[in-house]
């Protein structure tokens, strides 16, 4: 998962998984003092709970002349009224200890998970574009949410309960040893069998659980894709196709979860039969010892209760163990996410940047498809403030050039120079802070119109935002909304038209005030009226800026200083519009004729 793991890694856990799980505890380290206090109260609450069988045995089994099971100085535990008072005090103490333990564990867990979420998001947002090409967004978000929820339950409840059961087992066995070492040995005889079974079953359950988690992430990715592209799904009447595609995934999840449930059920059933069978046998032996006068009636009653507690703890441990194994698998996924390489922050800052760009014999293939050459020996220059247009059929390499300008990928051969400096030597953040993009498909984030424009410059003033909107020809339609710049947009807000979205994107770019502008077919999907407004805003934005225009409509690039004609990843021609249109046998001329016809 997350790009580097092999297929095998998706269904098995290795020793490395446990190492990664241990790495998670560094998130607990800042809160270790609170966590240790929580563990202290866990131990205290467990110990006080284990006084119950002894006191109850004394209450039910005492006849007034037997020595008390529990000896408390200056307290008469042969008197049932005194025993009841002591029990109430013990229950009160246990309630207080449990409350403090739960509060402290929650305090640590929520803060540690907050740190983990922050770290995961911080890493995720800094990963290179190639990472997101290798991993589906829906699968990533599902994986992170599911794994963190599982960790939350494990840290808050499962681990505490797991160790509480062990404390119960130790104290119960200790009491049984005090009563009769022979009975204790009979009880302990089943432990190795249960332990070996736990290891065998646990490994298999873990494997099935991890496979189910991966299938669940894949199904959530399909769900997100379908809901995001619901218009296309309905337009192509592919509802049934998507139902079948999603259905096949959840059937796989069902099979894995049922198989896991069968294994867990078999394991728990085996534990119940083995443990309670042993308990019944030991109680039978204890009853015989009572008849022979080897143990008192109070000891026998307490013995039965401790034995029941012991059996219940042994029965609970396997399921808790399986949950912890699932949490280890989740931790491995999260640690894998944190181990991916982020984009390098190293490099020189662009100072007094003019905006000159040069491609020198650039060749490039995407990391996941190295066998397909996308760009081949691309060379051109763009002077500061000039406009370079990129034209060509789909797949010719236009968008790839814009991706390389933004340093989304490193070139395989050649070099890209900004003001004569190799892009490899420029800090990524410094480069991108000097570039603005107006894409064909504008994404508006949930929030207000103002907040979306501020994405171009988060610290801008209200006056700067309004001025940017005016320059982008967006001010009038924004002011027509009831809440004006505070109008909510996105999934939960007002739906903007394509032209309105484009003008918000242009306002972002105006606010950013970049040296380099990339227009990725910004007007190709608009109607004539919207295109005129957007094109007018773009023309104003491009003044005195180095601009790269990926053009679908050739009419929009007539005034470009240089037009690069791309075909199969190569520049087959370049020049001004009039020069290229005059070449009747050229690719540009043919493209122009196709659009006119």
Protein language model features and the residues they cover:
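An intracellular "coupling" helix at the cytosolic face of ABC transporter transmembrane type-1 domains
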Residues: 30-33, 129-130, 146-155, 159, ...
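Helix-loop-helix
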Residues: 175-189, 259-332, 337
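ABC-type nucleotide-binding domain
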Residues: 73, 353-597
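Hydrophobic alpha-helical transmembrane segments of ABC transporter permease domains
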Residues: 40, 48, 97, 145-190, ...
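Short intracellular "coupling" helices and adjacent cytoplasmic loop segments at the cytosolic face
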Residues: 2-12, 110, 118-142, 146-150, ...
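Membrane-integrated ABC transporters
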Residues: 1-49, 65-83, 101-105, 109, ...
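Transmembrane helix-loop-helix hairpins at lipid-water interfaces of multipass membrane proteins
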Residues: 35-97, 177-182, 291-297
């Amino acid at each position: 998962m997350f790009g580097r793991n092999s297929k095998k890694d998706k269904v098995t856990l290795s020793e490395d998984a446990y190492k990664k799980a241990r790495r998670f505890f560094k998130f607990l380290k800042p809160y270790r003092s609170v966590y240790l206090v929580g563990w202290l109260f866990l131990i205290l609450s467990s110990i006080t709970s284990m006084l119950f069988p002894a006191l109850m045995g004394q209450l039910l089994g005492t006849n007034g002349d037997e020595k008390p099971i529990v000896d408390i100085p200056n307290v008469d535990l042969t008197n049932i009224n005194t025993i009841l008072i002591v029990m109430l005090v013990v229950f009160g103490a246990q309630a207080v200890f449990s409350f403090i333990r739960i509060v402290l564990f929650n305090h640590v867990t929520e803060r540690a998970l907050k740190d983990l979420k922050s770290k995961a998001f911080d890493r995720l947002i800094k990963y290179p574009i190639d990472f997101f090409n290798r991993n589906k967004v829906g699968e990533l978000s599902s994986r992170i949410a599911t794994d963190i929820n599982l960790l939350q339950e494990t840290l808050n409840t499962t681990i505490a309960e797991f160790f509480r059961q062990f404390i119960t087992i130790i104290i119960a066995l200790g009491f049984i040893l005090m009563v009769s070492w022979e009975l204790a040995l009979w009880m302990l005889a089943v432990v190795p069998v249960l332990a070996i079974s736990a290891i065998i079953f646990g490994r298999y359950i873990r494997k099935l659980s991890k496979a189910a988690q991966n299938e669940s992430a894949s199904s959530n990715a399909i769900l997100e894709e379908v809901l995001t592209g619901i218009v296309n799904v309905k337009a192509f009447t592919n509802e049934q196709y998507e139902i079948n595609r999603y259905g096949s995934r959840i059937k796989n999840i069902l099979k894995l979860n049922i198989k896991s449930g069968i294994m867990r059920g078999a394991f728990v059933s085996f534990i119940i039969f083995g443990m309670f069978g042993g308990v019944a046998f030991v109680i039978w032996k204890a009853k015989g010892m009572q008849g022979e006068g080897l143990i008192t009636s109070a000891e026998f009653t307490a013995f039965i209760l401790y034995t029941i507690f012991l059996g219940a703890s042994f029965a609970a441990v396997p399921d808790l163990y399986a949950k912890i194994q699932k949490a280890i698998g989740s931790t491995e996924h999260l640690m894998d996410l944190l181990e991916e390489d982020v984009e390098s922050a190293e490099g020189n800052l662009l100072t007094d940047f003019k905006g000159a760009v040069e491609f020198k014999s650039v060749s490039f293939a995407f990391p996941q498809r190295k066998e397909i050459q996308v760009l081949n020996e691309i060379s051109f220059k763009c002077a500061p403030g000039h406009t370079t247009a990129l034209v060509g059929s789909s797949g010719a390499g236009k968008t790839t050039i814009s991706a390389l300008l933004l340093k989304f990928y490193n070139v395989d051969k050649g070099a890209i120079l900004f003001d004569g400096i190799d892009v490899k030597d420029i800090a990524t953040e410094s480069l991108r802070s000097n570039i603005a993009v107006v894409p064909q498909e504008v994404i508006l984030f949930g929030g207000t119109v103002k907040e979306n424009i501020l994405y171009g410059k988060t610290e801008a003033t209200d006056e700067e935002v309004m001025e940017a909107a005016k320059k982008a020809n967006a001010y009038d339609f924004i002011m027509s909304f009831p809440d004006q710049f505070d109008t909510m947009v996105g999934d939960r807000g007002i739906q903007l038209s394509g032209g309105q979205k484009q003008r918000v994107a242009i306002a972002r770019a105006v606010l950013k005030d970049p040296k380099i502008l990339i227009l990725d077919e910004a007007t190709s999907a608009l109607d004539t009226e919207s295109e005129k407004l957007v094109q007018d805003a773009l023309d104003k934005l491009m003044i005195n800026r180095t601009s790269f225009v990926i053009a679908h409509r050739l009419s929009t690039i007539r005034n470009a200083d240089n037009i690069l004609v791309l075909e199969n990843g190569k520049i087959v021609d370049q020049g001004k519009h009039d020069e290229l249109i005059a070449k009747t046998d050229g690719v540009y001329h043919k493209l122009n004729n196709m659009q006119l016809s």
